[in-house]
Amino acid sequence: MSPLNLASPLTPRRLKRLPLALLLAGSASWTHGYAADSETPAPVPAGKPAANSSQLETVTVTTRRREESSQDVPTPMSVVSGQNLETQRVYRIQDLQQLVPSVNVAYMHARQSSVSIRGLGNNPASDGLEGSVGLYIDNVYLGRPGMAVFDLMDIEQLEVLRGPQGTLFGKNTTAGVINISTRAPTFTPERSIETSVGEDGYFQTKGTISGPLNDQLAGRFSAYRTRSDGDIKNEYDGDDLNGGSREGFRAQLLFKPNEDFNLRWIGDYNEEDSSAGTRVLYNTGPTINGVNLYQSRANAAGATLVNGSHRKVNLDNDQHVTVHQGGTSVEANWTLPSDFTLTSISSYRFWNFTPRNDDGLNVPASYNAGVSVEDKQYSQEFRLASPKGEFFDYVVGAYYFGSDLDNKSFAYYGPQADIWNGTAPGALANVTSVGNGHIKTDSFALFAQGTWHLTERLDFTAGVRGTYEEKSAWVTRDAPLGGATVTGAAATARRGRAGAYDSGDLNQYSSSPSGLLNLSYRITDDVLGYATLSHGEKSGGVNLAVGSAPVAGADSLLIGTERANNAELGFKSTLWDHRLQLNANVFWTQVNAYQTNAYDAENRVQYLTNAGSVRSRGVEFESTVIPLRGLTLNINGSYNDVSYLSYKDAPCPPEVSQAPGAPASCDLSGHQVVGASKWIGNANGEYKWNLDNGFEPYVTASYAFRSKAVGTVEDSDYGQIPSYAVVNFSTGLRGDFNQGQWEVSLWLKNAFDKTYYTTLWTGGNGGYEGLLGTPRTLGVTGRYDF
């Protein structure tokens, strides 16, 4: 990224690039006449107490495709309001794990990212595979986890559903769903401006404008821009890394000609230009017979290693990613005779990713390596919901999802490549290798779920889904370019790592059933108990990188179907005169043919594989309480024992694979699954003073703890993520001005400057690289709603 693009946020050049929404919000307005005539009430944020109230508000969700209280839904779920996200300054999907239990986000950058729930679904960089956790925004399924890696702006509500899903809506998943709902256009004028400034060059500005265009049509426009200098120092040239810029907008129209029909159109665009995903050296791996392979090869190549825990790297090439993504959707809802509701959701999205990656050294072992991706997806959903209040109510629907993805794998080796890779002299030095992959997916499904209200207190729910998917793919690699003419061992090594390859046509056809049985009983008016059995399946996929396929055969590129069986037992309660909400559940899940990532040490590529069977079992709880007027506390946590029941042909950790007489594979049965902390605990709270002069001072605090976790799939002693806890504080003041409300807050993220790692990565030669969490950051935010 050029220095020009990282200019100070207070320069005239930077001010010219403020989002259009801020300009609109400052200059445009809807007449107060519309506001006076509107019958749309001002919304109360979900899960927050109303002004001057000591009782919790009802949180409304549409999890079962009809509006109802979250406490009436007999399934484990977490609901976070948009206001809570703003108060806790959680504006990226990778920070969500600091708010809710059983969620882990493995994030490096937009491509190398994945979301897991209860330890299931941690498979980043899966170009040829959908995730085990479904990500939705405004009821549209996102085929790539990276499609959710943008700033969460203008959010109404975020819901996390745990366990297999698919009998009610959208795409089938085996681990759960994260459903993000943005604020819809309003027939009451709304405008907001927000700007934040913090350490390390952090600057974020957001704006929203909403209101009526006429009696039947309302519009909404939101935009943001975020930038930072970065928090990792490159010793090679003195530059700051792990920063950059992100910006985007969302435009909406809501057409509501009468009470029986509404249509909502959404269009959005986001882009990123950053050095996100800068990995630091975490561990150089094992020393065997007095030799540390990582250090010895680095020394032989002339590289100087630096301590990553000091937030330093030593890179002689760029670390850079660009992302362009966007899409459009149309949702229409009709109220039919007899109060049936018909819903149609149509969408199109695109996602383009281009990286530039260094090899982690300050010598030219590699000039650039990575995978660029271009993805387009289409979806159509139809749902019919029966009227509420009958003995039997139900939802039936049909769903189509299509995806067309191309990727390009590239490696530009430098003169020190053979020393660093341990290949014969001349094999890789100055060689260029380029490969291409393509996969087309067509998924068709029918689903239905119904509830029998057997008595006033007892309900029985059953759901079923049938999914049929076709995937066609191919993978190629061009003949290597450059390098010296070689023979013997060097030629063999070059053919293995960079030789020409063509997989031919690869095809997969799968039929995946899903099912749900649920019994719920209203123990008292304020306590609901439930038990659930569910089954979910997710079709297989294709490795879109050559890897070992020239030796193992093209069939080795195919990944089998993942199947999950799940059981839940839990309760939901609202107690203490609606001042305490307490929910808890136990769960047991077994996944067969679990899809995960592994590392091919010989070819130095990540690849997808089926890792035998996995069992996840544990307990989760969530509570919200108002112990006294003005104070709201949220406490949640989980214990999750997730391990491989069977994983016999797993990759070996370097302390085994580098030892003399090492086996070709290892048995990891009984080992903990990668990325899954056994213990997770989160607590946050806000205290507000309602003063007679109209001012509202407040303070907030949050605490997030995660126990240690396995860093990479081979479960090396040198690749473990230590436990950590992060503490955040903020204080602010709200007040009224000119029929609007202003707010100023001072915030401190990672208050005790804890050095912690969120994700680990296999670095080659037995070493490991890590992604550091955000250091202590002090900032200030100003906001005006009017």
Where are these regions (language model features)?
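Structural signature of Gram-negative outer-membrane beta-barrels, strongest in the C-terminal barrel
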Residues: 254-258, 384-385, 399-401, 437-589
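Periplasmic-side early beta-strands and strand-to-turn transitions of outer-membrane beta-barrels
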Residues: 179, 186-188, 196, 207-303, ...
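Gram-negative outer-membrane beta-barrel transporters
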Residues: 37, 460, 583, 588-590, ...
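Outer-membrane beta-barrel translocator/receptor signature
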Residues: 130-132, 144, 153-162, 167-249, ...
